[in-house]
Amino acid sequence: MTSSTGLPAAGATESESTEGRGTAVGRRRGRRIGRLMIGLVAALALVAGVGYTAYVGAVGSDQLIHPTGNSDCRTPLVRYGWTYEPINYDITDDAVLRSANPDMENCSSQGAAAGTEVITSDGVRIAGWYVPSADGSGPTGPTVVLAHGWGANKSEVLKYAVPLHAAFNVVAFDFRNGGRSSAAATTFGPREKQDLEAIIDWLERTKHPAHLAVMGNSMGGGAAVLAAATDQRIEALILDSTHARVEDIVSRRLEVDAGHPSLPGTPAILFGIWLRTGLNLMDSSPVDFIPALGHRPLLILHGTADVHDLPARSADVNYQAALAAGVPVELHMCEGAGHGHVIDTCPVDWGRWSVDFLDRAFGPTD
């Protein structure tokens, strides 16, 4: 030991003093090494966390704006025996497509690209089909536009025409990045709104329907709400399996499809989409635009087993927003239906709910 003067204490040998100093130095060195290790681990964790977040944001945003396209290319004639008019492409190409694809549910391509007759305000070419109603009401008869969901196309959404075809003209079209329409980033509504408006412009130029409604499935419903908020030509809306807020789509796909936590992945993906498109998708959530419908009626259909757009966070939220704003609204739930499968699980109910709603919305027809 040492005295307060720093000299060896009485009775302490020089070796004991040296050993004591060495022990103290060792303890201090050990503490420094411990702090360095903790700092290193924290730094590595930070780097790993930042790397993971950046990876999820980059990959997730790319997958969401560039979905794998639906390979179904069946036309109304092939699928249901219906006559139809092609929108913005030559009908002879359908024969070419059919001969090249014996299995039209799994086509190698969607055919020739759309022409120049229907172009959006940002230069995207849109293709579709016009299917006259079975009752022969003619082009001025009540018309329903079908807007498909994320990664789908006009062939996939055609099934919704089955209960409508008897009394309504029906239009099915490809959003950007799907079917015959131009390749462009998918944006879950804000730019798809322009695609829908281009189709309505075509209808107005060529058919002059007396009444017009839009049925949107999932993402298509979001685009329909955004369009209807500013386009009074849309007299009524049907939302099938449609989200309330865009961030919920991202978080649920992360959790359900990819097995990743919603945090920090959701904000990272939304940030990645902003970097790629310049759009803050949280500014385009349908629930925020539903009040703009005013007195135009809204029908909400949803499945109780939808794990992608949970009813409590989508259908219920949209319904309450409509009620609060005084929008005439109906809500029907299909027991056991998953996302986008209300019409598959409850086909009779879907038809009854939709046709009755449209009859009330359009009123008596001559």
PLM regions and their residue ranges:
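An N-terminal hydrophobic leader/cap segment in hydrolases
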Residues: 45-117
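Short beta-strand element of the alpha/beta-hydrolase
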Residues: 139-149
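The serine-hydrolase catalytic nucleophile loop
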Residues: 150-164, 175
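Conserved alpha/beta-hydrolase
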Residues: 164-182
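Hydrolase active-site cap/lid region
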Residues: 226-282, 291, 296
